[in-house]
Amino acid sequence: MSYGAEQAVRDVSFSVPNGEVFAIVGESGSGKSTLVRAAFGMLKQASISGQILLNGTDISTLSDSDWRQLRGTKISMIFQNPSAYLNPNRTVENHFKDLFRAHGESYDVSRVIDMLNLVHLTDGERILQSYPFQLSGGMQQRLAIALSLILKPGIVFADEPTSALDMLVQASVLDLMKEVTQALGATVIIVTHNIKAAARIANSIGVMNKGQLVEVGSATEVMAHPKDEYTRILLDSVMKVV
């Protein structure tokens, strides 16, 4: 995968079993966010070789209209900073209504309140009448999780979903993501620079360095017995911070 003459990601191949969480770990510039954004159809300007398969279909070749139908119902994305894409002029309820309308579904308020309860936003009726800027950062990210899952996609991508949150909130949001996606049977591919956070939520971990996937294994194996020198450096840096 390249931009012009610059190759951002190369020779990357992995598969994720249904219902599991796969974490892609690496420093800024390692190519991890580029990889998931390509898989979500956000990098049309990139030159992509190879395939991105969803249930046997190469989704990298889809038209724009096909991508619009796919996002939300089959795949979804949780971004780093929800305040950057939640519309401050629209109530929370209108965000859900817009999403249902975009995919030709009738709005179901009881279904939405059930989802809000699932992400621990328990005062559903008040939340629906609120505007995003009236919610805390942690509540906004819980709302983003609810929006990404309300149409029951099979795969959820999460690009640094906790990096904009306070340390005390990060762990609870990660635990919530795992709890909710497991309850719904969704497969999760999460990108993070924090290998400790990856181990908290993931069944398996892939480590990226300079555009390549240098190590893949179960979370337990990667944390306890890293095979690649770069993985060991990431683990050492976490230990030094702790």
Region spans (language model):
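Conserved ABC transporter NBD signature motif
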Residues: 48-58
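Conserved ABC ATPase "signature" region
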Residues: 58, 109-126, 235
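ABC ATPase NBD coupling module
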Residues: 59-76, 102, 222-226
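Conserved ABC ATPase signature
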Residues: 131-135, 139
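A short, surface-exposed alpha-helical micro-motif characterized by mixed small hydrophobic
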Residues: 198-200
